[in-house]
């Protein structure tokens, strides 16, 4: 069966070719357009092909043409009929230049193919211009087989066949053009066609004939007749550009209830009479279960025979059953006011295992009428839903006759009509049992005991032998909470009670005839004892004192250990010192996935494979180097549904691209830290290949900061930097070098937690490049603004080069996403760094933070702080917020000369709006205009109160605008030199 399905798949998956033009089938002149109209141009001739059929051909042989001369041949307008990529198969012969006696240096053995798109047949003999633009070059075609021309003999040689690919096409049609620049050749035939995926039925899913418009096109399928979609995503398959269907469907369909798959899983067949299929799925039709039948084809359920039923909770495929017969051999044992009944199971259980029992009771007074039993009787464990064949009845009245009817029930008893069979038993109680005990009183109460007394009941005959006391705490439920006490006198003492608790008490008496019924519940309460409370307080005070002494001892021990640690060395504090970093015993070390002989083995070892049915893609949120980035949801069995980010691998990938795409997962899967993006798993067993990570609601840090410019306090920004440093400290301890640490590669969640990401690029330096940049494996260039100088010059990447990049990230955060080095070119950045220039402090940046940046930018990489020292320094700032109030001043005692980005003179701006956009406050342009601040003269007089009235409520934005206004005032003073005339940085 599987072989048959496989063969069916192979035959149906063949690509279809739709012909647009085939000159071998043309019988009349082609009349294609040539240019120029001179001797030696393309000439249309009639000839015979290999099968001796008449065909139209074009020949050209101008081997002594003037330099720059070209002969063009253009086909008629060809409608593309929905095709995006068109294939052109050329059959041609070409003479070898050496065999031509008159061939000059201009003789060639190649020709060029072009195409031109248009929405209608508008081309003329002169338009479009006969040149590469507007014509689009397809390829320069060289002959694989050359024909040799010997003197006095006919030319001999093989026919060349070449297939070219045109596109992508977007207009209604196109022309194909051939350019000859000195070849001697004959164009024997031209076949223009496009490929499409044939109609396909597989896995009970029908996919329509499809013309591919991309490398890989998803095609939605529809279920065949009497089939329904399987759980999960809608059925889909991928149509490749070459007209082949790619792999098996993502999901498929399954036959509806009452139908089974047939003919190689391509259609659904109705179940025959006497068979059924209860659910949709891959199963086949089954014979009807016991006591049921189906009289029609396509049955999803078999009907029960007369007298048989299915319970509502029974599956459709369950046998039909019947109610049980009556229980047998009921035996009664009477003990005063209590009765024990037990019986045997019925002869017929009805074919079910959910057998239960129930009792009905009637009581008859002496010489009186009968009625259903009252509520004073108790049944243990209950009057119905009994699993075991016994019950104890308590509270029987003396000298009463009781009739009990015991019935057996199962899951279909409620569906049956007619009387329910039962087994009766009659019991008459004695008249000598004592009556119920009442009038219970409390004679003494303490915190842990109650003393009770009651009146002696009058027994009809004989004396009371003893009493049974039943009591439990009020509110307590269940048999385990009830306690019993026997006493021979009409009093009792209940001990071991809770202080201040309420108890419910009942008493019954026993004579020679047995126990009488329990009387009414009596409510009693124990007392609260203050002396006992004082003792507890004393114990609490003593316990607290002991705990205090223990804490003092612990503090002393910790202090001694800290002093010893300080005496051994003080390099744990942040300083300029450097030393060798050693990985402690048991520390996990990063393993490069490319060291594996099979990189897929690294993916299997470090990343969890996720079933694609657990993944739901909701929307595309971006595009990455390898494909799209989406937001989706992950719902694994037994786990809570979570929001995830999904990276997909675009279609048409190579195996190398697939390995590099999945390498990020095998890297990420080795990390587990709250400030490192968490890998959820990978999908590699279906298309498209996916990497799933936790979803970070606020996206990349740089764009998030620019969007919220001025809305965070310094302490909040330092907290973000501390999280990034903590993640980098973890990576350094794992011996992993990031190489591309930048704010764009830091993700932020809804709680403002920053996490390091982007572990997927394998980077290398471009050779012989005048502007050194890092290039990814797929060609994406990475700016050098974040890269340490030794990494640029010597390709030396270490944790120290990551520390340099971290300093740039600090500058990005404190400037709310400003571009490092502004608009300077890469070469200018390199030159400035070589001359020891460094970035200045961002506006309102604390001095301590800018000094930490400068330490990270030390030219000697050994002098840069390591990440544990960076974390320690940031922790000190967070613990001492006052240190963050000292704001850095430009060139104020800096150890390096600082770059300067001067603001242009305000006269360089054409309007107030242009000025606002230049200082990145363009969001308030309309507010300024509405408030009447339309000139620089008015803006120069603006105050903080005016800004509030306009709607500038953020303190950071107010500072930025007022600082620029102050700068504007200084520029307007007489004798003050103007700005630089532009935003170009100076150093």
Swiss-Prot record:
Keywords: Angiogenesis, ATP-binding, Cell membrane, Developmental protein, Disease variant, Disulfide bond, Glycoprotein, Kinase, Membrane, Nucleotide-binding, Phosphoprotein, Receptor, Repeat, Signal, Transferase, Transmembrane, Transmembrane helix, Tyrosine-protein kinase. The chain crosses the membrane at residues 540-560. The modification Phosphotyrosine is found at residue 987. Gene3D superfamilies: ephrin a2 ectodomain, Galactose-binding domain-like, Immunoglobulins, Phosphorylase Kinase, domain 1, Transcription Factor, Ets-1, Transferase(Phosphotransferase) domain 1, Tumor Necrosis Factor Receptor, subunit A, domain 2. Changing residue 469 to G: In CMAVM2; uncertain significance. It catalyses: L-tyrosyl-[protein] + ATP = O-phospho-L-tyrosyl-[protein] + ADP + H(+). Residues 976-987 have a biased composition (Gly residues). The modification Phosphoserine is found at residues 769-770, 911, 943. Residues 16-539 are extracellular. GO terms for biological process: angiogenesis; cell adhesion; cell migration involved in sprouting angiogenesis; ephrin receptor signaling pathway; heart morphogenesis; protein autophosphorylation. It is found in: Cell membrane. A motif (PDZ-binding) lies at residues 985-987. Changing residue 867 to L: In CMAVM2; loss of tyrosine phosphorylation; loss of interaction with RASA1. It is linked to Lymphatic malformation 7: A form of primary lymphedema, a disease characterized by swelling of body parts due to developmental anomalies and functional defects of the lymphatic system. Patients with lymphedema may suffer from recurrent local infections. LMPHM7 is an autosomal dominant form with variable expressivity. Some individuals present with severe non-immune hydrops fetalis, which may cause perinatal demise or fully resolve after the neonatal period. Others present with no edema and have milder clinical features, such as atrial septal defect or varicose veins as adults. Receptor tyrosine kinase which binds promiscuously transmembrane ephrin-B family ligands residing on adjacent cells, leading to contact-dependent bidirectional signaling into neighboring cells. The signaling pathway downstream of the receptor is referred to as forward signaling while the signaling pathway downstream of the ephrin ligand is referred to as reverse signaling. This is Ephrin type-B receptor 4. The gene is EPHB4.
């Amino acid at each position: 069966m599987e072989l048959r399905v496989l063969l069916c798949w192979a035959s149906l998956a063949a690509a279809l070719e739709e012909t647009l033009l085939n000159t071998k089938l043309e019988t009349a002149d082609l009349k294609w357009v040539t240019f120029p109209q001179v001797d030696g141009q393309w000439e249309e001739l009639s000839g015979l092909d290999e099968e001796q059929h008449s065909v139209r051909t074009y020949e050209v042989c101008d081997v002594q043409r003037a330099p720059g001369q070209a002969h063009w041949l253009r086909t008629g307008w060809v409608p593309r009929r929905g095709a995006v990529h068109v294939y052109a198969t050329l059959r041609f012969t070409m003479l070898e230049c050496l065999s031509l006696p008159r061939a000059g240096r201009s003789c060639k053995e190649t020709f060029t193919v072009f195409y031109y798109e248009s929405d209608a047949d508008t081309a003329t003999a002169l338009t479009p211009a006969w040149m590469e633009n507007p014509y689009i070059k397809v390829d320069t075609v060289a002959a694989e087989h050359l024909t040799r021309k010997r003197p006095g003999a006919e030319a001999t040689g093989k026919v060349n066949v070449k297939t070219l690919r045109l596109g992508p096409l977007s207009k209604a049609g196109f022309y194909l053009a051939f350019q000859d620049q000195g070849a001697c050749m004959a164009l024997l035939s031209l076949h223009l066609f496009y490929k499409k995926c044939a109609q396909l039925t597989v896995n009970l899913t029908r996919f329509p004939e499809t013309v591919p418009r991309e490398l890989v096109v998803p095609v939605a399928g529809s279920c065949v007749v009497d089939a329904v979609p399987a759980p999960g995503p809608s059925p889909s398959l991928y149509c490749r550009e070459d007209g082949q269907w790619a792999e098996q469907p993502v999901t498929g369909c399954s036959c509806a209830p009452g139908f089974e798959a047939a003919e190689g899983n391509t259609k659904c067949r109705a179940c025959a009479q006497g068979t059924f299929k209860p659910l949709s799925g891959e199963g086949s039709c089954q014979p009807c279960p016991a006591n049921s039948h189906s009289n029609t084809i396509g049955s999803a359920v078999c009907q029960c025979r007369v007298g048989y039923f299915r319970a509502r909770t029974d599956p459709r495929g369950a046998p039909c059953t019947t109610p049980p017969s009556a229980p047998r051999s009921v035996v009664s044992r009477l003990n005063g006011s209590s009765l024990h009944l037990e019986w045997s199971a019925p002869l017929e259980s009805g074919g079910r295992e959910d057998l239960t029992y129930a009792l009905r009771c009637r009581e008859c007074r002496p010489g009186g009428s009968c009625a259903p039993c009252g509520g004073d009787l108790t049944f243990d464990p209950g009057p119905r839903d009994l699993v075991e064949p016994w019950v104890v009845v308590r509270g029987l009245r003396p000298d009463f006759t009781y009739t009990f009817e015991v019935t057996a029930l199962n899951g279909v008893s409620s569906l049956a009509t007619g009387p329910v069979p039962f087994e009766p038993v009659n019991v008459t109680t004695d008249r000598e049992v004592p009556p119920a005990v009442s009038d219970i009183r409390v004679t003494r109460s303490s915190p842990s005991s109650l003393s009770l007394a009651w009146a002696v009941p009058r027994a009809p005959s004989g004396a009371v032998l003893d009493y049974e006391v039943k009591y439990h705490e009020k509110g307590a439920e269940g048999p385990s909470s009830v306690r019993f006490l026997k006493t021979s006198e009409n009093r009792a003492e209940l001990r071991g009670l809770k202080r201040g608790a309420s108890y419910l008490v009942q008493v019954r008496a026993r004579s020679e005839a047995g126990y009488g019924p329990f009387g009414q519940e009596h409510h009693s309460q124990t007392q609260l004892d203050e002396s006992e409370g004082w003792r507890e307080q004393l114990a609490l005070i003593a316990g607290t004192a002991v705990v205090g002494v223990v804490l003092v001892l612990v503090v002393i021990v910790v202090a001694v250990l800290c002093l010893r640690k300080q005496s051994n060395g003080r390099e744990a504090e942040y300083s300029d010192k450097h030393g060798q970093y050693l990985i402690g015993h048991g520390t996990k070390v990063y393993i490069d996935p490319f060291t594996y002989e099979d990189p897929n083995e690294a993916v299997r070892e470090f990343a969890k494979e996720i079933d694609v049915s657990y993944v739901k893609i909701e929307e595309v949120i971006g595009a990455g180097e390898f494909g799209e980035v989406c937001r989706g949801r992950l719902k694994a069995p037994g786990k809570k549904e979570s929001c995830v980010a999904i990276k997909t691998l675009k279609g048409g990938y190579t195996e190398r691209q697939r390995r590099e795409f999945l390498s990020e997962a095998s890297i990420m899967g080795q990390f587990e830290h709250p400030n490192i993006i968490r890998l959820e798993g990978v999908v590699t067993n279906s298309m498209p290949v996916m990497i799933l990570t936790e979803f970070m609601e606020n996206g990349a840090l740089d764009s998030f900061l620019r969007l919220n410019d001025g809305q965070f306090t310094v302490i909040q920004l330092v907290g973000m930097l501390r999280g990034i440093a903590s993640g980098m400290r973890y990576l350094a301890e794992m011996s992993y070098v990031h190489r591309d640490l930048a704010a764009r590669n830091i993700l932020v969640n809804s709680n403002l937690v920053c996490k390091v990401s982007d572990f997927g690029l394998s980077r290398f330096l471009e050779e012989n490049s005048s502007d050194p940049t890092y290039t990814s494996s797929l060609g994406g260039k990475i700016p050098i603004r974040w890269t340490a100088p030794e990494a640029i010059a010597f390709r030396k990447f270490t944790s120290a080069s990551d520390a340099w990049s971290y300093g740039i990230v600090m500058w990005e955060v404190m400037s709310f996403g400003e571009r490092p080095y502004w608009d300077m070119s890469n070469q200018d950045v390199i030159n400035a760094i070589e001359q020891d220039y460094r970035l200045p402090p961002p506006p309102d940046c604390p001095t301590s933070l800018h000094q930490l940046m400068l330490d990270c930018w030390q030219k000697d990489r050994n002098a840069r702080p390591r990440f544990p020292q960076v974390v320690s320094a940031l922790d000190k700032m967070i613990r001492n917020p006052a240190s963050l109030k000292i704001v850095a001043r430009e060139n104020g005692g800096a150890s390096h000369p600082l770059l300067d980005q001067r603001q242009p003179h305000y006269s360089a701006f054409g309007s107030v709006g242009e000025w606002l956009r230049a200082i990145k406050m363009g969001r308030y342009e309309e507010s300024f205009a509405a408030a009447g601040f339309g000139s620089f003269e008015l803006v120069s007089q603006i105050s903080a109160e005016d800004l509030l009235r306009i709607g500038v409520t953020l303190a950071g934005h107010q500072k930025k605008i007022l600082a620029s206004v102050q700068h504007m005032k200084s520029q307007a003073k007489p004798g003050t030199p103007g700005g630089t005339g532009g935003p170009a940085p100076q150093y």
